[in-house]
């Protein structure tokens, strides 16, 4: 009798284990044979480095991926055509690069997992259950920690913003800055014409001017005015990229685009293996590099530690 019970238990366990391993390997089999549609908004070195990291990461995971590349070169019509082809095709995954490609794909493609890259904001991705991605904007914590390494602690940070675009960001940044021992002064503008007076209000109020992505504040037309204000008032300006650093910003955070591609691949595999669940929220880049303008530091009489200068990817 006991022997009969043991046999029944063994059979039940065998059936259970078979089902578990069957489901596991079915998921792995699906993830290891992918047909990937890539929509590139533009052709540039950062886009190529990101795509290279994405491909390399999948290959390292022994994923057999067949890529079909749709290059839009900034043409909205080409993007729409690509999206329609993808919708009627048999694709496992869509990898979008740039806002032009991402916005169209998020609107039109609802039944295929989407991973997005080369975009600044994540608002639209958060509202799309089948999508995730890596945004270009660093987390507030990352930006302020970098500031701590380069500039004195306890300083007053100033920023200028348009509330429609960055109201929520500034509110969050103010709270985080305060928790890290900074004073925070933000000035809202409603038109580009408000910028000169906003800058002047900061002349005797802040120790550093923090540039945040804002289409009203930071433009090719306003850049000269902002950088001249920085030098004349000896208030360092923190830029958005090496182009800003080269033009006169004290420093800017830079991205490792290859690693962003690797991050996207990791998100893609997670998304594919958990398709019944909502996609995870988009994430910022995990690696922060930086460029420094040593000449600007000298003009502003700011001492930059030698290890910080040596760690920069570019020194001007």
Name these PLM-found stretches.
Residues 3-13, 25-316:
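Short hydrophobic alpha-helices and adjacent helix-cap/hinge residues
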Residues 15-23:
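Hydrophobic core
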